[in-house]
Amino acid sequence: FVENVRGRESYSFEYDADWLKSSANYMYLDPDLQLYAGRQYPTGAKNVFGLFADSSPDRWGRLLMTRRERILAEQEGRKPRKLLDSDFLMGVYDETRMGAIRFKLDKDGPFLSDDSETPTPPWTSLRTLEEASRQFENDESGLEQKWINQLIKPGSSLGGARPKATVLDTKGNLWIAKFPSKHDDINVGAWEKVTHDLARLCGF
C-alpha cells in the first residue's frame, strides 16, 4: 500500500490471508516482514521494505527516469515533476526488473510496465547502447531524448551508479552489460573480471 501525505509517501504491506495459510511455515519474503495478518510498516530509517527496494532502480536507473521526466516536462511546457519512490518502482520495465518480483494492480491483469512493443535489445546492440550511455553522460543539458529512448528500458531497473543495460543473447538469456564511464580512472571492467576469476578459483 502507498499513501501520499503532503507530498511524502508512506508504505505498508499486508499478506493475503490465503497465502499466509499456505506458506506461513516456511517462507519469509523479507526479514522485516513477519508472518501475521494485518498491515506492517517499515521501521527505523527505512522508507520501504527491502523486498521492494531491491526491485527499484539505484542511481543509474533513477538518473535515467529523472532525465526522462525533464524531457517530458520540456515538451509539455510544464515544470518537471518530483519523482517519488513509487514512480521509480513502478517505472521499471517488467521484463528486466531486478529483485525476482513482479507487480500487478489486478490479480488477472497485466504486469506493470510490460511494454511488448519495445522489448529488451539483443546483445548485437551492445555498441549502440555503449555509445548511447557515453553520449548520455556527456549531455550536460540532459534533454537529448534519443539517448534516453535507447537506454530507459534496458537500463532503468539496474542498480549501482555505473552506466549499464540489460540485453538478450541468442538463446533468450538476459545479460547485464556494464559500460565505461567518463568518471573512470582505472579499467573497471578488467578488475571486475579479475575478481570474478579469483572467486571461481576459490570455489565460489
Q: Where are each of the predicted segments found?
A:
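Phosphate/dinucleotide-binding and metal-coordinating scaffold of catalytic cores
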Residues: F1-F204
